[in-house]
């Protein structure tokens, strides 16, 4: 598959291994947003096309990735994969972490952010954690110097009278006052972190809860959207407006502090859009919780001034497992074989425009009796074991909506991929909690 449309990537004069000033890294996550709900996406729905100009500016000033994936189809597992660079099913993290569970991402697993700390980076997580509730699993214990956010997967956007310890916005373990709109609070905290660490280098993971439910937009945002007739879609869109405004705050702060030229900014979403709450994943099949494309393929945009030319389109399949290896190499570190990462560094590919070698991407949910899927080049295999349906094979280069099963006419391709998928699954453990628990 051709990776870059024309010669769109600037060559670097030197690598970051010897750079005097390592780049800052800002990773922006939305939550449960739709594949077709951001203006930079070619299939963005008309009703929200103009609502995300600041997020879309990242793609126009940098790159849009057409085949960007998460390693999980729901919130918590996808974060577990990204944070470690390893398929989360290797350590039993198939399912969302239930509220109050006395468990989390196994302590034996190393977060990539801890490795960034060792390379001299100041690190922050602002927003949603969802990777463990007991003290041993706290973000401050897993590699984040500063944590400002909530431990649980969601909460109301407006102040709560008596928030539980897992839903209150805390700062390094201490509850903060319930005041203000959550998306604004997270955006303001991110700007504060940038200003206080402008001498860098820093890694900021801004993990918004928007537009995850509950659908509680600010009234001022909802009033702008009267043209959207369906109330659910209108309220969802209101959450996008606030999300975009706060991404804008972050971009403005980087610029005002003189940091934008030496900062990589990546925007993506944690899993497929939740259509039941207003998201739109057109033209993909499926939604959050599904291993069809609509559950795991997500919007990706990135800006890296002087390194990636404005308007670049990257077609190579990439997955969030690749982020931490990439960041470590950007920081001047070396990815060790002993870490047994599944993700690969994208740095050389981004720097030199080299296509990535073809590799399989895998998914599983709910253990060895749940659904599983795989992508290899243009081929997508989906095996719906939960409904006891036979494996299906799709050609994504012609059928991104997964409508035409080609398994009967491509039996050898199906056989090869099933063998690879079986081998991968033999290396996994059963879920630690939830459906399929071992």
Predicted regions and their residues:
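Bacterial N-terminal signal peptides
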Residues: 7-15
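Formylglycine-dependent sulfatase
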Residues: 4, 16-392, 396-438
């Amino acid at each position: 598959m051709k990776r870059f449309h024309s010669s769109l990537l600037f060559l670097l004069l030197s690598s970051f291994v010897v750079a005097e000033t390592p780049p800052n890294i800002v990773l922006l996550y939305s939550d449960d947003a739709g594949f077709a709900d951001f203006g930079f996406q070619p299939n963005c729905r008309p009703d929200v096309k103009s609502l995300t100009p600041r997020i879309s500016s990242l793609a126009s000033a940098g790159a849009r990735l057409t085949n960007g994936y998460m390693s999980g189809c729901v919130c918590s597992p996808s974060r577990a994969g990204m944070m470690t660079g390893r398929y989360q099913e290797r350590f039993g993290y198939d399912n969302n972490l239930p509220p109050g569970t006395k468990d989390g991402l196994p302590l034996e697993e190393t977060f990539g952010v801890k490795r960034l700390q060792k390379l001299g980076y100041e690190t922050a997580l602002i927003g949603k954690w969802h990777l463990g509730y007991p003290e041993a699993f706290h973000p401050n214990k897993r590699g984040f110097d500063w944590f400002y956010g909530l431990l649980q997967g969601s909460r109301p956007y407006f102040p709560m009278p008596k928030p539980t310890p897992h839903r209150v916005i805390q700062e390094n373990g201490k509850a903060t006052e319930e005041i203000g709109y959550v998306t604004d609070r997270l955006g303001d905290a991110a700007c504060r972190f940038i200003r206080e660490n402008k001498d860098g280098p820093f890694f900021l993971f801004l993990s918004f809860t928007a537009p995850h439910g509950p659908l509680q937009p600010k009234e001022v945002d909802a009033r702008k959207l009267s043209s959207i007739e369906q109330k659910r879609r209108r309220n969802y869109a209101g959450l996008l407006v606030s999300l975009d405004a706060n991404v804008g705050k972050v971009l403005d702060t980087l610029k005002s502090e003189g940091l934008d030229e030496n900062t990589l900014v990546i925007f993506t979403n944690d899993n497929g859009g939740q259509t039941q709450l207003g998201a739109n994943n057109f033209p993909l099949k499926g939604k959050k919780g599904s291993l069809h494309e609509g559950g795991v393929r997500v919007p990706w945009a990135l800006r890296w001034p002087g390194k990636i030319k404005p308007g670049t389109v990257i077609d190579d399949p990439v997955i969030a497992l690749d982020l931490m290896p990439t960041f470590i190499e950007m920081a001047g570190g070396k990815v060790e074989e002993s870490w047994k990462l599944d993700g690969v560094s994208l740095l050389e590919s981004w720097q030199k425009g080299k296509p990535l070698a073809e590799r399989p991407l895998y998914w599983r949910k709910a253990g060895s009796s749940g659904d599983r899927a795989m992508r290899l080049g243009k081929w997508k295999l989906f095996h719906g074991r939960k409904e006891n349906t036979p494996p299906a094979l799709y050609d994504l280069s012609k059928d991104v909506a997964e409508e035409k099963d080609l398994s009967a006419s491509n039996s050898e391709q199906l056989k090869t991929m099933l063998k690879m998928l079986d081998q991968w699954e033999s290396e996994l453990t059963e879920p630690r909690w939830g459906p399929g628990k071992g």
